[in-house]
């Protein structure tokens, strides 16, 4: 029961801040995060901006969703998604952690949920 409550609370926080992670941070941390994102964009030739555009395009298509599978534990993975500003393109129910169950199980769950005929 405690685990279910914990995940409900995590979901509430994720959904509340998925488009504004800065709301979780102090003004100084928010500014530092923005500087860090800017530096990352410069160093990676706008990787994050390009990735976000691609993910938004996929999300805008009929019958298309973005799914993230990670080997990071779920809560830290959710934090990273928010910090990178990708919460709006990855609904929490489409983020899978393979840490405890493995990638194969994640793919089985996705196939069970969406079917085999996917692109």
From Swiss-Prot:
One of its GO terms (molecular function) is protein tyrosine phosphatase activity. It catalyses: O-phospho-L-tyrosyl-[protein] + H2O = L-tyrosyl-[protein] + phosphate. Keywords: Activator, Chromatin regulator, Cytoplasm, Developmental protein, DNA damage, DNA repair, Hydrolase, Magnesium, Metal-binding, Nucleus, Protein phosphatase, Transcription, Transcription regulation. Its EC number is 3.1.3.48. It is found in: Cytoplasm; Nucleus. GO terms for cellular component: cytoplasm; nucleus. Binds 1 Mg(2+) ion per subunit. Transmembrane segments: none annotated. Its main location: cytoplasm. Its cofactor is Mg(2+). It comes from the Eukaryota. It is an enzyme of class 3 (hydrolase). Coiled coil: none annotated. InterPro entries: EYA, EYA_dom_sf. The keyword Coiled coil does not apply. Belongs to the HAD-like hydrolase superfamily. EYA family. Tyrosine phosphatase that specifically dephosphorylates 'Tyr-142' of histone H2AX (H2AXY142ph). 'Tyr-142' phosphorylation of histone H2AX plays a central role in DNA repair and acts as a mark that distinguishes between apoptotic and repair responses to genotoxic stress. Promotes efficient DNA repair by dephosphorylating H2AX, promoting the recruitment of DNA repair complexes containing MDC1. Its function as histone phosphatase probably explains its role in transcription regulation during organogenesis. May be involved in development of the eye. This is Protein phosphatase EYA3. It comes from Gallus gallus. The lineage of its organism: Eukaryota, Metazoa, Chordata, Craniata, Vertebrata.
């Amino acid at each position: 029961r405690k685990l279910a409550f914990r995940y409900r609370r995590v979901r509430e926080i994720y959904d509340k801040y998925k488009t504004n992670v800065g709301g979780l941070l102090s003004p100084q941390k928010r500014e530092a995060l923005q500087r860090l994102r800017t530096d990352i964009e410069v160093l990676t030739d706008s990787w994050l901006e390009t990735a976000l555009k691609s993910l938004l395009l996929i999300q805008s298509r009929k019958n298309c969703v973005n799914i993230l599978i990670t080997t990071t534990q779920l809560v830290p993975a959710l934090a990273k998604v928010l910090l990178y500003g990708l919460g709006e393109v990855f609904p929490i129910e489409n983020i899978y952690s393979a840490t405890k169950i493995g990638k194969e199980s994640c793919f089985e769950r996705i196939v069970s949920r969406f079917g085999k005929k996917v692109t």
